UniProtKB/Swiss-Prot annotation:
Residues that bind Mg(2+): 69, 71
Amino-acid biosynthesis in keyword set: no
Enzyme kind, highest EC tier: hydrolase
Residues annotated as the enzyme's active site: 69, 71
Entry protein name: Class B acid phosphatase
Signal peptide as annotated in the record: 1-23
Organism of origin: Proteus mirabilis
One Pfam entry name: Acid_phosphat_B
Amino acid sequence: MRKVTLTLSAIALALSLNGAAMAKVHMPEVVSQGVTVTELAHQQPIKWVSVAEIEKSLEGQAPMAVGFDIDDTFWFSSPGFYRVKLEYSPNDFSYLKNPEFWEKMNNEWDKFSMPKQVGIDLVQMHLKRGDTVYFITGRTQTKTETCVTKYVQEGLNIPA
């Protein structure tokens, strides 16, 4: 009797392991199928545009508000960030969460940032058109800020 019980138990166990258990999980709709390496290799060529082409495309349009990022877009600020990173956390990016870093960057080390010529040209084109230019930054706000506004204004030739 014992052998029969063990045999039936073994058969029942084997049969129960045969089926896959499926949890009922909500699956969202597929939004994007993604791309393959082949598709990436066949991308369309990039069309670079000049400030003159942008200006021409805006002819006849009413003045508009435009916004531009500051750091490493219009403003080559990597040297200042690099200098302060070495001081606060040379081996990681924890310096970005350190208020002392931002005080130093926004008040001292931004003087090592440089405007990019294309940024100067683009801002001047928009100002000439009568557009309102806004600058956007992801920088952490500090108690004081003596460099950023001053150097962006001076570097991009923005009238006071």
